[in-house]
């Protein structure tokens, strides 16, 4: 009998994906900031879809530091505000619908979402490659919000 591997275990990352948060001035710029090139967006969308098919699970994504151009888009102090970025992001999907946890830790950064957050996450990542962003998802009660930037 052949064991069927979860969809997410077959996922392979491609493209450039950046994630960061600001270490100062966070009252006006709270949470995590996500940007990716077109290949990175497609890769993240495939991961989200794979986790959805599996119903639960997790994968770790390699993170690139944001470029100067990426940092200028949110315009926190003209792109010069201090920031920190993880080298890895663990994305986990759990069956409990409303779960959202995204603590500030960076070793690795860990985003855990319930099924209700799958579609908003998918829409946000899709929007990056279309030049849409400057909005966030997530709750401040159990984790930092996630901002999408092009």
Question: Which residues fall in each region the model found?
Answer:
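Positively charged, low-complexity terminal tracts
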Residues: 1-150
């Amino acid at each position: 009998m052949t064991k069927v591997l979860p969809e997410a275990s077959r996922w392979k990352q491609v493209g450039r994906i950046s994630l960061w948060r600001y270490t100062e001035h966070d009252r006006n710029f709270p949470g995590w900031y996500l940007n990716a090139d077109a290949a990175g967006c497609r890769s993240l969308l495939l991961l989200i879809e794979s986790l959805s098919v599996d119903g639960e699970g997790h994968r770790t994504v390699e993170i690139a530091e944001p470029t100067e151009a990426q940092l200028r888009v949110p315009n926190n102090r003209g792109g010069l505000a201090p920031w920190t970025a993880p080298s890895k992001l663990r994305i986990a999907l759990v069956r409990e619908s409303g779960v959202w946890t995204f603590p500030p830790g960076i070793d690795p950064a860990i985003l855990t979402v319930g099924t209700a957050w799958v579609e908003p996450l998918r829409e946000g990542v899709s929007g990056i490659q279309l030049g849409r962003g400057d909005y966030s998802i997530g709750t401040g009660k159990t984790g930092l919000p996630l901002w999408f930037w092009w």
